[in-house]
Every structure is written in structure tokens, then in C-alpha cells.
From Swiss-Prot:
<keyword id="KW-0653">Protein transport</keyword>
<comment type="subunit">
    <text>Forms a conjugate with ATG5.</text>
</comment>
<dbReference type="GO" id="GO:0034274">
    <property type="term" value="C:Atg12-Atg5-Atg16 complex"/>
</dbReference>
<dbReference type="GO" id="GO:0031386">
    <property type="term" value="F:protein tag activity"/>
</dbReference>
<feature type="region of interest" description="Disordered">
    <location>
        <begin position="1"/>
        <end position="86"/>
    </location>
</feature>
<dbReference type="GO" id="GO:0000421">
    <property type="term" value="C:autophagosome membrane"/>
</dbReference>
<keyword id="KW-0813">Transport</keyword>
<feature type="compositionally biased region" description="Acidic residues">
    <location>
        <begin position="1"/>
        <end position="13"/>
    </location>
</feature>
<feature type="cross-link" description="Glycyl lysine isopeptide (Gly-Lys) (interchain with K-112 in ATG5)">
    <location>
        <position position="205"/>
    </location>
</feature>
<comment type="function">
    <text>Ubiquitin-like protein involved in cytoplasm to vacuole transport (Cvt), autophagy vesicles formation, mitophagy, and nucleophagy. Conjugation with ATG5 through a ubiquitin-like conjugating system involving also ATG7 as an E1-like activating enzyme and ATG10 as an E2-like conjugating enzyme, is essential for its function. The ATG12-ATG5 conjugate functions as an E3-like enzyme which is required for lipidation of ATG8 and ATG8 association to the vesicle membranes.</text>
</comment>
<protein>
    <recommendedName>
        <fullName>Ubiquitin-like protein ATG12</fullName>
    </recommendedName>
</protein>
<dbReference type="GO" id="GO:0034045">
    <property type="term" value="C:phagophore assembly site membrane"/>
</dbReference>
<keyword id="KW-1017">Isopeptide bond</keyword>
<dbReference type="GO" id="GO:0000422">
    <property type="term" value="P:autophagy of mitochondrion"/>
</dbReference>
<keyword id="KW-0833">Ubl conjugation pathway</keyword>
<comment type="similarity">
    <text>Belongs to the ATG12 family.</text>
</comment>
<feature type="compositionally biased region" description="Polar residues">
    <location>
        <begin position="57"/>
        <end position="80"/>
    </location>
</feature>
């Protein structure tokens, strides 16, 4: 038993020495392996342009896929020419100028007067003077007295010549051919009628 103990004691140090002797060899092997293995190099990032070329998620701003921008797509700061103003868009005056207002007032009065009719009654003088089928007529007051004479001559079928004349009177005087019927009516009308006497020969001076 003692011998076995001694044998065991002799063998144990040998195994311990052998195990401890193997440690440096393994360490040297690991160190040699680390030296043989190249160090990893940092991964190089691709360029941004190359990424854009192959990246399907790029936006149209980074990598436009459509046609290039045209002049119509650009923002133009040049002001557009103004269109001519239409009549509906023209300014509305709050009041007319004094001269224009007076002119319109005069025209309005003349227009109203042109629609006013004066009643005339024709009365023949002398036995040889023909009478009209109808003795009462109406005429616009803006007409001249020469229109009345022309109308009477046409109704009586009297030619305008030296041998055949017609004389027209209001009361006892012969009005001028350029006088207006309205003026004569306002001065000499009786009971709403302006009586015009006529004859083929001169009756009053």
C-alpha cells in the first residue's frame, strides 16, 4: 500500500508537469492562429449617387423618373399682362357731371315733348276754297309750321307753283314756316284746339 502510494505520488507530479507543459504550447498555437487570421477591414459604404441609381425607394426629388422640367413647370415671377377692362367691369360713377346731367335732362324733356300731340282744326275761308273731308288732325308739337302747310297742300292736291298757292292764318296773321307748332299752340289754342284758317287767295295784308 505504501508503494502504491509512492507510485501514485511519483506519477502525479509527472501528469501535473505534463499538463502544465502543454499550456504554453496551446497558447502559442492560439497566438499563431490570431496572427495568421487577417484583421477584418471596415465595410466601405457605397456612394450616395450609386445608391440612388439602384435604390427603388428614391423620391422624385432625388432621382426623377419623369421627363425633365419644362418652362411651364417653372415658377415665373414676370407679371402677366392685364386684360382690357370690359364694360361690366368699368367703374360706376355715383353721379354724372353737371354738364352731362343737364344735357340728359334737356334730351329727356325733348323726348317727352316729341310725344306730345297738338290738335289742329282746319277751317276754309272763301266760297272757292275746298274743304277737307276731315277737319281735325293731330301733330307733334315739335314739328314746324311748314310741315302743316305741306300736309294741307297734299290733302287738297294743290301744286306748289306761282299760279296755285295756299295761304294759312292763325287768327289774323300768317305764321312763319320755321315756327314750331307747340309754340303756336301754347299761345293761340282755344279749348284745346289750334284753329288754322286757309284759303287759295291772300286774305289778310
Amino acid at each position: 500500500m505504501i508503494e502504491s502510494d509512492s507510485d501514485t505520488s511519483d506519477d502525479a507530479p509527472q501528469e501535473y508537469v505534463s499538463a502544465s507543459a502543454n499550456i504554453p504550447a496551446q497558447f502559442e498555437l492560439a497566438t499563431a492562429h490570431m496572427k495568421a487570421t487577417p484583421e477584418p477591414q471596415p465595410t466601405q459604404q457605397p456612394d450616395a449617387e450609386a445608391l440612388h441609381d439602384d435604390d427603388p425607394l428614391t423620391t422624385t426629388q432625388d432621382h426623377p423618373t419623369g421627363p425633365s422640367a419644362t418652362a411651364s413647370d417653372t415658377i415665373d415671377s414676370t407679371p402677366q399682362p392685364m386684360a382690357p377692362a370690359t364694360l361690366s367691369a368699368s367703374a360706376v360713377l355715383p353721379s354724372l357731371p353737371s354738364d352731362t346731367a343737364a344735357l340728359l335732362e334737356t334730351f329727356s324733356q325733348q323726348l317727352q315733348q316729341s310725344n306730345v300731340k297738338c290738335q289742329l282744326k282746319f277751317r276754309p275761308i272763301g266760297g272757292a276754297t275746298p274743304s277737307l273731308k276731315q277737319s281735325v288732325y293731330k301733330i307733334a308739337e315739335t314739328q314746324q309750321f311748314g310741315v302743316v302747310v305741306k300736309f294741307l297742300r297734299k290733302q287738297l292736291k294743290i301744286k306748289n307753283s306761282q299760279s296755285s298757292q295756299i295761304f294759312c292764318y292763325i287768327s289774323s296773321f300768317a305764321p312763319g314756316l320755321d315756327e314750331t307748332v307747340g309754340s303756336l299752340y301754347n299761345r293761340y289754342a282755344i279749348r284745346g284746339e289750334l284753329t288754322i284758317s286757309y284759303c287759295l287767295n291772300q286774305a289778310f295784308g
